[in-house]
C-alpha cells in the first residue's frame, strides 16, 4: 500500500478502543492533519448542559447523533479540500451506536433499574427508531464510500476504564464492535484490523500505508496521550461546573422520559 493512494484515513472502533489516542499520535507521527470533531461528552455539554450522557432520552440521543454528524462532516470537508486527513472514527459510528441501542436499550451505561424502566417505556417506539436508523444507515454508508479511502479498525482488547464516565457497558462494546466492522467490510474500501499497544498499532499502520514519519513513535504516543488527557480534563471541568444534584426525583424523571 502507498500513502499516496490513501488521503482520507479512518481510525475506526467502538467506545474506548483508543481511537482518539491512536489518531492523534498518527497525526503527530506523519504530519497528516487530524479531523478535530467534538467528542460525544463535549456535545452533551453544548446541547444539554448539566445532563449526564446516560440520562439522555431517545430524542436527545438522536439530536446528539445529528450534531456530531454535522461537526464531523464540516471538519472532514475542510481537510479533504486541503489534501486529506486522519479521522477519529467515521460517519458510521453514530449509526452503529444507534443500532446497537436497539439491542441493549437506549442507556446501556446506566444503573440496572434505570435500564429496566427505560427499556420498557421505549419499547413501543422501537419500530420507528429502527426505520429511522435504516434511513440514517443508507446515508452514512453512501457518504463513507465516497469520503474515506481506508479504515484501520481497533478491536476491543481491554476493558473500559472504570472511571464512572462511560455511557455504555461491555456488552454494548462487543455488539457495536462486531456491527461496525461488518458495516465497514461491506463498503468495499480496504479495512485493516490493528492490535496491540499504541506503539504497535502505529507501527502497523505506518508500515501498511508506506508513508514517511516526522518523529519517533514513542514521542508521538507520549505527546498524544498528554493531548488527550488535557482535553478530557477540560471537558470534565465543564461537566462538573454544569453538574446538578442527582436527587431521587431527578433520577426518576430521567428514567421515565422517552
Give the role of each language-model region.
Residues 1-6:
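Phosphate-binding P-loop
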Residues 14:
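P-loop (Walker A) phosphate-binding loop of NTP-binding proteins
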Residues 18:
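Conserved glycine(s) of the Walker
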Residues 24, 28-71:
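Conserved substrate/cofactor phosphate-moiety recognition/catalytic segment
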Residues 102-196, 213, 221-222:
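A glycine- and Lys/Arg-enriched "phosphate-lid" helix/loop adjacent to the NTP-binding pocket
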Residues 166-258:
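NTP-dependent small-molecule kinase module
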Residues 63-126:
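A basic- and aromatic-enriched beta-loop-alpha substructure that forms the phosphate/nucleotide-
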Amino acid at each position: 500500500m502507498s500513502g499516496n493512494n490513501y488521503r482520507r484515513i479512518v481510525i475506526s472502533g467502538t467506545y474506548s478502543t483508543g481511537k482518539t489516542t491512536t489518531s492523534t499520535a498518527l497525526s503527530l507521527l506523519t504530519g497528516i492533519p487530524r479531523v478535530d470533531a467534538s467528542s460525544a461528552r463535549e456535545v452533551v455539554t453544548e446541547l444539554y448542559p448539566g445532563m449526564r450522557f446516560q440520562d439522555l432520552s431517545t430524542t436527545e440521543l438522536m439530536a446528539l447523533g445529528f450534531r456530531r454528524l454535522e461537526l464531523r462532516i464540516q471538519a472532514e470537508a475542510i481537510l479533504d479540500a486541503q489534501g486529506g486527513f486522519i479521522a477519529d472514527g467515521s460517519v458510521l459510528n453514530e449509526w452503529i451506536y444507534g443500532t446497537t441501542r436497539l439491542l441493549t436499550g437506549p442507556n446501556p451505561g446506566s444503573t440496572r433499574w434505570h435500564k429496566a424502566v427505560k427499556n420498557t417505556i421505549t419499547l413501543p417506539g422501537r419500530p420507528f427508531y429502527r426505520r429511522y436508523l435504516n434511513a440514517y444507515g443508507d446515508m452514512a454508508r453512501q457518504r463513507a464510500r465516497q469520503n474515506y479511502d481506508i479504515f484501520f479498525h481497533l478491536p476491543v482488547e481491554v476493558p473500559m476504564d472504570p472511571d464512572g464516565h462511560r455511557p455504555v457497558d461491555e456488552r454494548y462494546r462487543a455488539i457495536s464492535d462486531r456491527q461496525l466492522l461488518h458495516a465497514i467490510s461491506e463498503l468495499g474500501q480496504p479495512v485493516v484490523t490493528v492490535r496491540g499497544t499504541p506503539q504497535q498499532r502505529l507501527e502497523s499502520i505506518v508500515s501498511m500505508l508506506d508513508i514517511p514519519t516526522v518523529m519517533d513513535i514513542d514521542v508521538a504516543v507520549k505527546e498524544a496521550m498528554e493531548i488527550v488527557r488535557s482535553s478530557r480534563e477540560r471537558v470534565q471541568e465543564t461537566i462538573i461546573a454544569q453538574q446538578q444534584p442527582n436527587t431521587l426525583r431527578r433520577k426518576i424523571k430521567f428514567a421515565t422520559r422517552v
